[in-house]
Amino acid sequence: MPHPVQLGKKVRMSYSQINEVLDMPNLIELQKEAYDWFLDEGLREVFNDISPIQDYTGNLILEFVDYSLDENPKYDVGESKERDATYAAPLKVKVRLINKETGEVKEQEVFMGDFPLMTDTGTFIINGAERVIVSQLVRSPGVYYNRQFDKTGKQLYSATVIPNRGAWLEYETDSNDVVSVRVDRTRKQPATVLLRALGYGTDQQIKDLLGEDERILATLEKDNTKTAEEGLLEIYKKLRPGEPPTIESATSLINTLFFDAKRYDLAKVGRYKFSKKLSLANRIMSHKAAENVSDPQTGEILVEEGTKIDREISLLIQNSGINEVHVYSEENKKIKVIGNHFVDIKTHIDFDIQDLKLRERVYYPVLREILDTFDSEAEIKEALKERKRELIPKHILKSDIVASINYAFNLAHEIGNVDDIDHLGNRRLRSVGELLQNQFRIGLSRMERVVKERMTIQDVDLVTPQALINIRPVAASIKEFFGSSQLSQFMDQTNPLAELTHKRRLSALGPGGLSRERAGFEVRDVHHSHYGRMCPIETPEGPNIGLINSLSSYARINEYGFIESPYRKVDKKRDVVTTDIEYLTADEEDLFIIAQANEPLDEEGKFGNKRVTSRTKFGGIDVVPFDEVDYMDVSPKQVVSVATAMIPFLENDDANRALMGSNMQRQAVPLLITDAPIIGTGMEYKAAKDSGVVVVARNSGIVDYVASNEIVVKLEDGQKDRYKLLKFKRSNQGTCINQKPIVSKGERIEAGDVIADGPSTDRGEIALGRNCLVGFMAWEGYNFEDAILINEKLVKEDALTTIHIEEYESEARDTKLGPEEITRDIPNVGEDSLKDLDERGVIRIGAEVESGDILVGKVTPKGETELTAEERLLRAIFGEKAREVRDTSLKVPHGENGIIVDIKVFTRENGDELPPGVNELVRVYIAKKKKINVGDKMAGRHGNKGVISRILPQEDMPFLEDGTPLEIVLNPLGVPSRMNIGQILEVHLGLAAKALGWKVATPVFDGANEFDIMDALEESGYPRGGKLKLQDGRTGEAFDNPVTVGYMYMLKLHHLVDDKIHARSTGPYSLVTQQPLGGKAQFGGQRFGEMEVWALEAYGAAHTLQEILTVKSDDVVGRVKTYECIVKGENIPEPGVPESFKVLIKELQSLCLDVKVLTDDDHELEIKETIDDDAGEMSLEHGDFDYGLEEPTVPEGSHITDEEEKDEDNDSEEALITEEDFEPTSVETEYAEDDDEFDGYNDFKA
C-alpha cells in the first residue's frame, strides 16, 4: 500500500517498498569538489613540479613559495553576466629569487593573471556566458595486457605500458615466440635489447633475471646485440635515426625518456595502477609454491613447497620484501614470478606516519635503506619525508619494466590475467580540477622557458622576480581552455534538469580522448562495470552514442579519478546486511558477490530467501546461497542517472524509448504556469534543489519580509539574511529565468529549505510539463504517425504557454570616415517609425515591436564623394550638418516580434569596459509569449513524442460521461511497437491519483505494480480495467469501445514551429555564384536540387523550370528586371545567362582552356563579365530587392551566436547586391543549406 512521504513542502504517496539506507549525495558535488581540490592542492602540485627554475649556469634560482586567490572578484556573478566580463579573481604568487654567487635573496608577490572562479552552482562565467566544464573519460595510465590468436590458433600476448605523459612501451610476441618491444611508437626490436640497455648486458644476466623460458631463448637468438653498450646504441639508432650514436647520448636519452620525472609522469593514479597490476601478491595468489619461501629478515619460512598460496600469505610474502617467487603452472612447470618491489609501509613501521601522506605502497629498496641507516622514530620520519619522491616515484623504474616483461611471459602459463580496456576499472575521469591543472602546467612550462631566457639576458644584480616572470603564456593557456576547449561547453540552460545533467556529463571525446570517427562499437557499448557508475540509458542518439554518458545517481569519484558506487556490507559472521556503506571501484567490485537492492530482508536484516539473485565475480549473474553474498546494492536507482530516475515505471519501458525520454526531458521549455507531475518518482525535489535554480535558505529563522524580488529572513541572533530573486532573465537558450517566493511572512524555515521557486519548479519540485487528461484513440486520422490532437482549452488557459527572451545588440564603432552615432535623427525615416524611441534613439521598455521596427537608431558616415558646386555651397553655409550618413539602425529581424522588457546601455563615458573601437553598446531584450501551436513538438516522459496536428475546439473533443472533455488525444498505435508500456501505467495511476487528490511517488524499479494500480482505480471509484466510456463531442454519440483515459505528464519541447518556419521572396545572394544563400539564419531560399529539377523535367514544365533556374536564382540582370516588371505591372522579360554558367567558363579558362559560346549558326556569343550599369541603377531605384523595400541586411547583432555572427558579417553586407557590391570587396563564405547546422551551436560570446 502507498504511504505518505514528505518531500520539501509536498507530501507524496510513495509505492516504494525499500528503505533507503543512504541519502543521495549532492548532485553537483563532482564539479565543486574537483575545483576545490584544484585550488587547494592542484595548483600547489604544479608549482612544486616546476619550481625551482635555474638558469643555465646554476647561479640564479627562482622558487614559487606560496600562492593566494583574492576572494573579492572585481565583478560578482550577476555583474559579470551583465557586462560580458569573466567572473574571476586575481591569482597572486609569492616568488623567491636566490643569487648563489652573492647569497642575495629577493622575495616578491607577483600577479599571475585573473583566474576564473566557479559559481555556487558549479559553472563558470566566461565573457558573460555561463559555461560548464564537462568531465572527460580517458584510459587510465597503467600496464595493459591482451591476448590474440594467430592463424594456427596459438595464443599471442601483447602489452602496453601507458604513462600519464611520456613515452609508451609496447611488447608483443609473434608466432615464433620472439618477444619484441616498441619504445615510443618506433620500430620494434627484440625485448632483450631493452633489457641490455637497462644494464642487464650479457645473455647470462638476462637468463638469470627472467629464467630459462623458451620465449627468452627465442628472443636472445633473434637479438644481434650481445652487450649493454650495443643494446644502448641499438635503441638510440631506432629512436634518433640519422644521428651519430654514442654511449653517452644513448644513456642520457634512455634516462630522460623513462627516468626523468619532468619528461615521464605516471601521476598518482599510474603508480597506483602499476603497483596493483604488477604486485607479486596478486599474481602468486591461488597458485602452488614451487619452493620454500622464507622471510629475508628473520629467515622464518612463510610458505612451504607445494602449498597453495592464499591472499594473506601472498601479502605477507610481498610485504617482507621478497620480489621473486617460483610457483607451479597448470602444467606443473616451475615458473618464475617477479614483482615490482613495492610494499605496504605499515608492515615495516609501527609508529604513526599519517601526516606524511604515504598512503600508497612504497619502493622497498629505498625503504630498506632508510630503516637500515636510521634508528630513532624522528630520524626515520625525517628521512621518509625527504625521500618521498623516491619512495613513491612519479616515473617508471627498472623493476617496473622487468616486472611488466615477466608478467607477459607468465600469461602464457595462465599466471596473471588479460585486461579489458572498456572496463571502468581501466577508464578514469579527468574532472575540472585535473583538466585545469594540466592546462595550467602547459602555461607554466611555456613561462619557464621565458624565465630561463631572461635570466641569461638580464643584469644579475638588478634582476627582480617580477622582471623575470611573463604571465602572458599562463593567462593565455587558461583563457584558451575556458574559451575554446572541446570540454568547455556553453551551458544547456533550457530547464533545471538540463543544467544539472550537463554538469554530471561524462565525455570520452576531447583532447587526449577518442574521436567520433575512430571510436568503435566496443567503447560505446554498455559494460557490466557501468552498473551503479554510469547510466546505461542516458546517452545521445546519433554519432555520439555511448561516447557521452551521464554519471549514475549515487556514484562518486575517488582520488584517483575512478568512479565508485556505494554498497551495503554484509556481516558474514551473523549473515546480516548492515547499514554500513562501502564505496567500491569497478575492479574492486569484480572480486565480490553483490545482491540487488530489492532482495527481501527480514527485520534483523537477514536475507528472506535461501538463494539470492546476485551479480557474481567479473560481471556474471547467478543465483547463489545467501551466505556467499558479500555486499548489497543501496538503492534500485543507483544504476541510472538523475534524468532517467525521473521516468516513472521505467522498468516497463523499452530501453530505446527510455533513452529518448531521458533526453527529451532536458528539452522541455519552462511553462508559464508550472505544474508538478501527479505521477512522480520522488526524485523531483532533490533534482530541483541541487540544480541551483531554486533559492535555498542558508540559515534557519523566521521570514521577515517577502516581495516578488526579495526575501528577508530574520535569524535567531537578530541578524538578517537577504535573498535577491532573479526576475525575467534570459537563459543561455533564450528561455525565461524567473524566481518567485513560496514562503509567507512569519513562516518558520530551516536551513536547507527551498524558499523560492525557479523556472520549471513547483513548490520546490521539478515541474517540466503539465498533467493533461489524455485518451488513447484514433480521431479522424489527425493522430496518424504520432501526431497529437489537442484541446483549444490548453491554448486559452495558457496551460502550455512559454516565455522566450531574445537579446539584440547594436554597437557604435569608430569607422575610417568618422564615428557611428546612436541617435533619433535618422535620414528618410518617418516620425511613425520613431514613435517608441526615446530622445537618445533607443526604444522604450514596454513597447510592442513587430518585424522591421527600429530598436536602436544608428547612423554611419558615408564615403565622401566628389561634391558638385551647389553641394559645396550648401556645405559652406550649413557646415558639417549636411554630411551624408546612412541608416544602420538595429531592427527587429524578419519573423520576430514581442515586448521590450529590458535595455542596457554601456558607454565609454560611464567608465564601462568596451572592446577597442566601440564607443557605445546598446542591448535590447525582447520577450515573447509563445502559446502552443500546430507544429510544436510535445512528448511524454517515456519517449512518446509527437507533433501537434490540430487544435480542436473544446466542444468537439471527445468527452467523459460526466462531460469532461479530453485535453489530448493520442494514437494507441504508438504504444505496442514502441514497447513503452510505462505511459499506459502512468495514465491509469494518474486517473486514480487525480480522483483521490494524491501526488504519487513511484520510484524506478521499486514502484507501483499492475495490481497496486488496479487497487487505486477501485479505491477512486473507477473500473479496475481503467477504461472509460467516451462520447463524440461533435455528435454526442458514445464511441463503440471503452477508451483508456487518464492523466499523463506532457512536456512542450524546445523545437517550436515559430523558430523553424521561414519564408523569403528576395534576400541575400552568395557573392561568387550569385545564388541565394540557404538556411533561416541567413534568410536564405529553398534549394531546388537536381532531383527536383528531374521532377519538373519529367512533367515537361519548361517555363517553370527556366524561371527557377534563372530569374529566381542567379541570373543577376534578369532578376533585377523581373522585379522591376512586377512592380510596374509589365510583362516579364526573357531570362538571361545564369551567373553559375559564367563561373564555369571562368573556371575552365583558369585551366587554360579557351572556351567560347557559339550560337546555332556558329556566331560567337558575347557574355558580359559584369552586371551592366542600368541593372545597377535599377537596383538602387528599387531599394535592393529584399523582403520589404528596405536595405536587405540581416539586422545587425540580432540573436546570433558567434559563429553565425562571423558569417553574418560576410553576408549581411557583402552577399547582397547593394550599391557597394558592384565592386565586390571580400570573399564570401558558402553556407550550410540546412538550418539544423545552426541548431546545436555552442554560442560563446567571444
From Swiss-Prot:
Transferase in keyword set: yes
EC primary class: transferase
Compositional bias annotation for Acidic residues: 1202-1223, 1230-1240
CDD domains per the UniProt record, alphabetical: RNA_pol_B_RPB2
GO molecular function: DNA binding; DNA-directed RNA polymerase activity; ribonucleoside binding
One Pfam family cited in the UniProt record for this chain: RNA_pol_Rpb2_1
GO cellular component: DNA-directed RNA polymerase complex
Keyword tags: DNA-directed RNA polymerase, Nucleotidyltransferase, Transcription, Transferase
Entry coiled-coil feature ranges: none
Catalyzed reactions: RNA(n) + a ribonucleoside 5'-triphosphate = RNA(n+1) + diphosphate
GO annotation terms (biological process): DNA-templated transcription
Region Disordered, annotated ranges: 1171-1246
Stored InterPro entries: DNA-dir_RNA_pol_bsu_ext_1_sf, DNA-dir_RNA_pol_bsu_external_1, DNA-dir_RNA_pol_su2, DNA-dir_RNAP_su2_dom, DNA-dir_RNAP_su2_hyb_sf, RNA_pol_bsu_bac, RNA_pol_bsu_CS, RNA_pol_bsu_protrusion
Its EC number(s): 2.7.7.6
NCBIfam families xref list: PRK00405.1 (NF001616), rpoB (TIGR02013)
Assembly behavior: The RNAP catalytic core consists of 2 alpha, 1 beta, 1 beta' and 1 omega subunit. When a sigma factor is associated with the core the holoenzyme is formed, which can initiate transcription.
Family designation: Belongs to the RNA polymerase beta chain family.
Function according to Swiss-Prot or TrEMBL: DNA-dependent RNA polymerase catalyzes the transcription of DNA into RNA using the four ribonucleoside triphosphates as substrates.
Protein name (database record): DNA-directed RNA polymerase subunit beta
Protein source organism: Alkaliphilus metalliredigens (strain QYMF)
